[in-house]
């Protein structure tokens, strides 16, 4: 595997790097500017005939999703229209583990479990997605249509 962390400004180096790629995993956060950048990357990959693209959504904060201040996983996947292989909650245990030099995968945390599941999906295993949506799922949205202000 070759991993590229690409800035928003796509240059010739990016185009050279993807020339031999047969698969791309786009990692984004659920913020409007990041989604725009990811969409631009997807467009460039499509125009270069790279068809196998997958999505990881990073740093999801459920408190913000519940307040309506952050896009949901479903919102992001609907906008970008590529298969999701993982969603990572914004987990303070990641910061603590990183500061202590502990591997995130080994942490007993939601993020650690999400990372492990993503690794398994990359390797072709079929593993279920963790529930991150909380009360913002389908039935919650449906019931929200009937609430009076």
Report the location of each language-model feature:
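Secondary-structure junction/capping motif
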Residues: 71-72, 103-104, 137
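C-terminal boundary of histidine-terminating zinc-finger modules
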Residues: 98-115
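Generic recognition of short, well-ordered alpha-helical interface segments
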Residues: 33, 71, 110-113, 117
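Hydrophobic transmembrane signal anchors and adjacent membrane-proximal interface regions, especially
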Residues: 68-70, 107, 132
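Conserved catalytic-core segment of NTP-binding enzymes
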Residues: 1-96
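P-loop NTP-binding site
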Residues: 83, 93, 113, 117-149
């Amino acid at each position: 595997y070759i991993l590229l962390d690409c800035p928003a400004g796509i240059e010739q180096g990016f185009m050279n790097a993807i020339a031999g790629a047969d698969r791309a995993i786009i990692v984004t956060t659920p913020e409007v500017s990041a989604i725009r950048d990811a969409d631009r990357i997807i467009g460039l990959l499509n125009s270069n005939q790279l068809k196998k693209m997958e999505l990881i959504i990073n740093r999801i904060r459920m408190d913000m999703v519940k307040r309506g201040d952050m896009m949901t996983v479903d919102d992001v996947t609907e906008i970008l229209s590529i298969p999701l292989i993982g969603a990572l909650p914004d987990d303070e245990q990641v910061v603590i583990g990183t500061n202590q030099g502990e591997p995130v995968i080994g942490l007993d945390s939601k993020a650690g479990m999400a990372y492990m599941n993503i690794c398994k999906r990359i390797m072709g295993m079929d593993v279920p997605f963790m529930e991150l949506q909380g009360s913002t799922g389908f039935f919650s949205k449906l019931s929200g249509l009937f609430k009076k202000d």
